[in-house]
């Protein structure tokens, strides 16, 4: 499924797989268009996903944390991408090194838009009922000038992104 990048691991919601000498081990044995995945590699590169585009993916969000994909090829602002009834049910969204919290219907934080090919953790209350949704179809100009690009870090402060990240939302 993944292109020619030299991957050492793939993490999904409640599953993972690691490559040891070219053989994959773990509980993750297939990928699903509706699920999100974080991939690990020893080298910088772009992950090419091989297969048919999946723009009409239906997602089901259960209570607590959900790792899901963003299936469109165009970036889209959070508020434009999510149907209103879903926005009301999600209190935070976390990406790789970025996050936003829903403050009375406004998304506040470093995550401004969903990017093509990315996975996101959607946080919901622990007792929430399942909801099913599809992202709104992007239209020209949806992502306007929004960007999730973080500032360049000076060389002496460069770090490796951890899969064990934490975010704290302080009022």
Predicted segment positions?
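Aromatic/hydrophobic beta-strand junction motif of beta-rich domains
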Residues: 168-171
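N-terminal exported-region signature
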Residues: 1-164
């Amino acid at each position: 499924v993944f292109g020619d990048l030299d991957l050492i691991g793939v993490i999904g919601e409640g599953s993972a797989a690691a490559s040891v000498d070219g053989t994959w081990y773990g509980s993750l044995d297939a990928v699903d268009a509706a699920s999100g995945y974080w991939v690990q590699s020893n080298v910088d590169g772009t992950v090419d996903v091989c297969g048919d585009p999946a723009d009409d993916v239906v997602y089901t969000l259960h209570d607590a944390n959900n790792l899901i994909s963003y299936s469109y090829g165009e970036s889209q602002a959070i508020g434009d991408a999510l149907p209103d009834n879903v926005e009301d049910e999600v209190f935070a969204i976390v990406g790789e090194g970025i996050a936003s919290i829903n403050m009375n219907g406004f998304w506040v934080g470093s995550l401004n838009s969903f990017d093509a090919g990315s996975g996101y953790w959607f946080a919901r209350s622990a007792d929430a009922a399942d909801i099913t949704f599809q992202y709104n179809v992007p239209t020209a100009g949806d992502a306007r000038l929004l960007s999730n690009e973080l500032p360049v870090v000076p060389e002496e402060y460069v770090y490796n992104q951890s899969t064990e990240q934490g975010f704290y939302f302080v009022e």
